Amino acid sequence: MSEEKKDEILEQETVETKEEIKTEEAEQKTESLEEKVARLESELKESEEKFLRAYADFENMKKRLEKEKYQAIDYASEKFAKDLLTPLDTLEMALNSAKADVDANELLEKLKEGIELTLKNFITTFEKHNITKVETDGEFDPNVHNAVMQVDSAEHNSGQIVQELQKGYVLKDRLLRPSMVSIAN
């Protein structure tokens, strides 16, 4: 064989070898990329599952808190209502004592005693729940008093409260009902 042919064959074998090496490298890169894609897809799927679980937990918590909020609103006055049962019981006892065979003076005394006890129970219950009476001593305050009439009074200055006609009440710092008062001219 001639030198030229040998060189040609050698060159062709070198090219084929280089192509085989490139093909092997490409196959290895392809396998490496496929593994990487598979790993990334797996990580993505895992992240999606974690997100869906976290979102479901969030939604469940949101529903639970909403339910608890409505229950708190529905039963907010439960303690107050239970505390009102004592004055109610006192009134019922006073009425039952009126049915007993006693003379009128004794009956009147028992009813008066029952009403006083009931009033005391109401006041105690109100204080327990931060319900206080609006003060009506001194100057008229339009924020907590409602002037229903003006009267002449030698003992009071103009604008001072002369008489409380109906008590007013405050729950903590919120006015439940203003006091109905008469004020001096």
From Swiss-Prot:
Keywords: Chaperone, Cytoplasm, Stress response. Residues 1-40 are annotated as: Disordered. The keyword Cytoplasm applies. GO terms for molecular function: adenyl-nucleotide exchange factor activity; protein homodimerization activity; protein-folding chaperone binding; unfolded protein binding. CDD domains: GrpE. Its main location: cytoplasm. One of its GO terms (biological process) is protein folding. It is found in: Cytoplasm. GO terms for cellular component: cytosol. InterPro entries: GrpE, GrpE_coiled_coil, GrpE_head. Belongs to the GrpE family. NCBIfam families: PRK14140.1, PRK14149.1. Participates actively in the response to hyperosmotic and heat shock by preventing the aggregation of stress-denatured proteins, in association with DnaK and GrpE. It is the nucleotide exchange factor for DnaK and may function as a thermosensor. Unfolded proteins bind initially to DnaJ; upon interaction with the DnaJ-bound protein, DnaK hydrolyzes its bound ATP, resulting in the formation of a stable complex. GrpE releases ADP from DnaK; ATP binding to DnaK triggers the release of the substrate protein, thus completing the reaction cycle. Homodimer. HAMAP family: GrpE (MF_01151). This is Protein GrpE. The lineage of its organism: Bacteria, Pseudomonadati, Campylobacterota, Epsilonproteobacteria, Campylobacterales.
